[in-house]
Amino acid sequence: MTCLLCHEIDLSQLTFVELILLKPKQNVICQTCKGSFEALSREMGCQTCCKQILRKQCQDCIYWGKKGIEVNHFSLYRYNEAMKKYFSLFKFQGDYLLKDVFTKEIKAALKRYKGYTIVPVPLSHEGYQNRQFNQVIAFLQSANIPYKNILSKKDGGKQSANNKEERLKQVQQFTLKNEAELRDNLLIVDDIYTTGATIAQIRKLLEEKGIKNIKKFFISTLKSCKFS
């Protein structure tokens, strides 16, 4: 197979039977590129968001705690240079096959959330028109994870274009599409955890509807704190 990240041809992942039958499994990146992603662990960093720090809680989580917003996140990987390149190709250059890179890891991680309804963070209409797919839904579909698409997002510019103060001043961007789909235990799934502003808005919206048990899951988390 030709790696979609480094474009090198990699035959090391093929079994003898696959080579004979010429029916290789659909790996889309090589082992070298896959190994460049840094897995996160709560045991080695922030106990509430998985940022890799030398304290039990990072400044971002302390900040949100003072605002009365509970932080309960789990993230698979650190947002390093390899992850930055991956998301650039997947989200902004539209290489849709890259949705399959973390399928195995997502399946394994979400098994711990039995009894939770999976809710993907939506794109705005403008964002969807530009990208033509929701990357979070693409991850879930690749892993055959059922989900409820109960949130919608207003148009209003990209979060990544805003600084800390601008993110904090943003009015509520999210609305509920169908309150009848609400459940007691919700797992909000997003791609990258940055400041927590997006998740704080979603949590506020859901808590106003009486939902208290809300957890969050991310593919990747920035290693630095935005509110320190």
Identify the role of each PLM range.
Residues 1-228:
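Glycine-rich phosphate/pyrophosphate-handling loop used in enzymes and phosphotransfer proteins
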